[in-house]
């Protein structure tokens, strides 16, 4: 019997899911980016699993506790559920440089691959930094999208200014 591996949409948190205000850990500072819910619903309809992969060095720096981060995750997941969106899992790196999970290393992405038997070549990673793109390359993710208004150079598939532009791109390609 032949089983197809599952495709995944990986999302960075700060700058993709929420507006990046540097070290966001309080609910009152968390503001969803325009278009995130529509983008996620599109990929759910295409049978992708949804994952968040986020560096959270503010924990190691002592700016906030892991419990603060987890409380914000709980709030965020509930807001996604209100929009009929299931995030399959959140992966986070609470460390500073030097660990295997911190992007641009691929530890978080490879953990998801192993836990969910993912088809990385047919998966997508959307991030707002070149370190996200490098992590995606390191994990052999097939499609890398950089969402950033500032032109960047790097080994990524496509750069878009915002999430609505990304959604239009995928709809045009019928991905």
Feature roles, as predicted:
Residues 36, 40-73, 89-96, 136:
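Substrate-recognition element of Asp-dependent hydrolases with the DxDx(T/V) motif
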Residues 17, 60, 64, 129:
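Gly/Ser/Thr-rich beta-alpha loop segments that engage phosphate groups in nucleotides
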Residues 12-14, 55, 128, 132:
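Acidic active-site catalytic centers that drive phospho-/nucleotidyl reactions
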Residues 8-10, 51, 124, 128:
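Hydrophobic "anchor" residues on beta-strands that sit immediately upstream
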Residues 2-3, 67, 74-89, 96-125, ...:
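Asp-based, Mg2+/Mn2+-dependent phosphohydrolase catalytic module
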């Amino acid at each position: 019997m032949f089983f197809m591996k599952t495709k995944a949409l990986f999302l960075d948190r700060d700058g993709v899911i929420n507006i990046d205000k540097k070290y966001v850990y309080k609910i009152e500072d968390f503001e969803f980016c325009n278009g995130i819910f529509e983008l996620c619903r599109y990929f759910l309809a295409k049978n992708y699993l949804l994952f968040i992969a986020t560096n959270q060095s503010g924990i190691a720096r002592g700016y906030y506790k892991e419990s603060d981060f987890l409380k914000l995750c709980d709030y965020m997941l509930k807001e996604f559920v209100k929009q009929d969106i299931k995030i399959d899992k959140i992966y986070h790196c609470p460390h500073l440089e030097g660990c295997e999970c911190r992007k641009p290393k691929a530890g978080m992405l490879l953990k998801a691959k192993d836990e969910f038997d993912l088809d990385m070549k047919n998966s997508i990673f959307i991030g707002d930094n070149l370190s996200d793109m490098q992590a995606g390359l390191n994990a052999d993710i097939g499609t890398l999208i950089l969402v950033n208004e500032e032109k960047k150079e790097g080994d990524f598939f496509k750069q878009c200014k915002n999430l609505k532009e990304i959604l239009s791109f995928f709809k045009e390609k019928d991905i």
